[in-house]
Amino acid sequence: MRESLLYGLTAAVVTTLWLRWVMRSEVQAAVERDPAAGSAWQVLFLYPSVSAVAFHRVAHVLHRSGLPGCRFLARLLSQGARAATGIEIHPGAKIGKGLFIDHGMGVVIGETTEIGNNVTLFQGVTLGGTGKEKGKRHPTVHDNAVIGAGAKVLGSITIGKNAQIGANAVVIREVPANSVVVGVPGRVVRQNGEKLRQE
């Protein structure tokens, strides 16, 4: 009894400290990238993306724990977060530090998605599958990428570092680092600061 109480208290303290650290990087990302952010306190309490990512961090730990019933609890937590924030993140998704989801409503992040550090997503973004794959079926988004409002990034593809994807683009092919992609289907129009000739 005494050991389980001590274990529970230790787990609670570690989880609290961990969430504070995690939320700090999300809050800082919002303050730095959103000109409308008044203060860190405003972001912490009023930005749904911070809440959604915090819920996800807990759900992800539960999802990966392998303990009986934890996957169900993880899905329950993620569905509660979706209802509260309008942002759907599967508990299996791997997310780095400093994710900023601006406005957030309608964002969907699939189970096998991997997101690097300091990525920005706008409202209505889908990081989803094509429905044709098994296993790794969602995108990998590398550090500092920006994905515009309404963009759909589908399949087990890679979005390179510092890539920018324009609003409403539909991306189903690899995106190189330091490039800009627009259109349906998405095409690279700029890479390493150079405008590309379209043929």
Task: Name each model-derived stretch.
Residues 134-138, 196:
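Conserved phosphate- and dinucleotide-binding cores of soluble alpha/beta proteins
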Residues 1-81, 196-199:
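Terminal amphipathic alpha-helical/low-complexity segments used for targeting or macromolecular assembly
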Residues 84-85, 90-91, 96-97, 102-111, ...:
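Left-handed beta-helix
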